[in-house]
């Protein structure tokens, strides 16, 4: 290796030349999320938490609000401390107290890696971890930021500059961050993953149709989504009306909850779809519903890398998605599903009609999609990549043992 290359590869964030870390033993990781409500980020953190090799990693799983359905999956897992740092608001006095608690927790437990997921954990915990002397800090960004306010994007960019690594789950997010001025060499991409699905369900099973009061042979189209502006559900409803004009028996399920649920229900009624579209709210049996669906649609206006898309493909359901964010990284258009432009009900309806009227083509896409998930988006692969990233950073030039790191007097008071 040339001297210049050696210096470049062993120069830390403060400009000091260091040899790789000789850290041995288990790596202690503190992960922080907002809550345990079911969502893409929370599901991925749960998957990693359950999958990390306990002989090599000692996981601490922190949150800001100790609520959510995924807690039950973790309750049976032994030896995972789950501290809560309830700040209430970033601007409250409580935030200062919780910051001191977090800094003390990092030092008292000898944490090697602090890994935050999402806007508020990033803004709160990254600077605290840095000031507390955490050897490695990773900030995760899980979407393209279209839903964020300008000040939130600026704040997150400033905070993430303090991290050793910014972890994203799609190339599209990486490209967006680079355009916003993030340093490309600090960004790593590890895509979302799903567990293998039970594909034994049959469209002939009456369960979902009987439950909804529909004909046993009705074609069923599903949308799995949080109900907010960026999910494009209003365009799906317009497309559903067009589909219903040609396939009168078609029925539509919108599975999920959110702030605009009532508005969307009113929109469905205004379109004459009250008897064809059902908003189920939150469901814990998504797998069963998917097994009996003919088609899954993701009409988003913006995406990172959609768990709903992965889950649908893993279940062997043909998919249609908008060509935004990380969707083209999951769906190969015309091979493992169909991609359509966002905000285009006509194109979406045409794609839905194509797959509903050509079941052999839909089955071919479904088989290719489930194979793609098995090969590229397994939880085992994702966990292995996370473990490799942790090891790489701990062995890298930025690693400073916690005992040797300077600590701000503020956190010692």
Q: Which positions does each model-derived feature cover?
A:
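Short hydrophobic beta-strand element within catalytic cores of glycosyltransferases
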Residues: 318-321, 331
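Short His-centered aromatic/hydrophobic patch
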Residues: 116-124, 141
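A short, active-site helix/loop in glycosyltransferases that binds the activated sugar's phosphate group
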Residues: 163-189, 194-198
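Aromatic "clamp/platform" in nucleotide-sugar-dependent glycosyltransferases that forms part
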Residues: 282, 301
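A conserved, positively charged/aromatic
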Residues: 138-167, 180
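Conserved acidic donor-binding segment of nucleotide-sugar-dependent glycosyltransferases
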Residues: 333-334, 338-345, 354-359
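N-terminal strand-loop element at the rim of the active site
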Residues: 6, 20-27, 31-39, 43-97, ...
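A conserved mid-protein helix/loop that constitutes part of the nucleotide-sugar donor-binding site
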Residues: 42-50, 219-245, 252, 259-266, ...
């Amino acid at each position: 290796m040339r001297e210049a290359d050696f210096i470049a590869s062993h120069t830390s964030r403060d400009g000091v030349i260091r040899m790789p870390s000789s850290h041995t033993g288990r790596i202690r990781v503190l992960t922080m999320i907002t809550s345990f409500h079911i969502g893409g980020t929370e599901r991925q953190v749960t998957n990693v938490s359950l999958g990390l090799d306990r002989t090599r990693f000692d996981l601490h799983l922190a949150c800001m609000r100790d609520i959510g359905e995924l807690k039950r999956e973790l309750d049976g897992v032994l030896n995972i401390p789950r501290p809560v740092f309830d700040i209430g608001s970033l601007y409250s006095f409580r935030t200062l107290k919780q910051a001191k608690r977090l800094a003390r927790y990092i030092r008292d437990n000898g944490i090697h890696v602090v890994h935050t997921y999402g806007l508020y954990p990033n803004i709160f915990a990254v600077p605290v971890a840095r000031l507390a002397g955490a050897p490695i800090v990773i900030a995760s960004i899980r979407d393209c930021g279209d839903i964020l306010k300008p000040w939130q994007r600026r704040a997150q960019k400033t905070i993430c500059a303090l991290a050793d690594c910014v972890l994203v789950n799609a190339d599209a997010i990486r490209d967006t961050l680079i355009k916003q001025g993030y340093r490309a060499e600090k960004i790593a991409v590890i895509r979302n993953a799903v567990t293998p699905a039970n594909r034994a369900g049959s469209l002939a099973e009456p369960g979902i149709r009987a439950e909804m009061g529909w004909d046993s042979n009705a074609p069923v189209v599903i949308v799995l989504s949080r109900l907010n502006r960026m999910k494009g559900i209003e365009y799906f409803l317009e497309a559903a009306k067009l589909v219903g004009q040609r396939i009168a028996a078609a029925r539509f399920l919108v599975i999920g909850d959110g702030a605009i649920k009532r508005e969307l229900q009113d929109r469905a009624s205004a379109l004459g779809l009250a008897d064809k579209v059902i908003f189920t709210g939150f469901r814990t049996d998504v797998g069963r519903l998917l097994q009996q669906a003919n088609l899954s649609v993701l009409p988003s206006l913006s995406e990172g890398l959609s768990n709903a898309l992965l889950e649908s493909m893993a279940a062997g359901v043909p998919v249609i998605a908008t060509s935004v964010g990380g969707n083209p990284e999951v769906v190969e258009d015309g091979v493992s599903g169909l991609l359509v432009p966002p905000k285009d009900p006509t194109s979406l309806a045409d794609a839905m009609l194509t797959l509903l009227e050509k079941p052999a083509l839909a089955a071919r896409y479904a088989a290719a999609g489930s194979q793609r998930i098995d090969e590229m988006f397994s939880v085992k692969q994702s966990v292995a990549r996370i473990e490799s990233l942790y090891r790489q950073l701990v062995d890298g030039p930025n690693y400073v043992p916690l005992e040797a790191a300077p600590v701000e007097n503020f956190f010692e008071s």
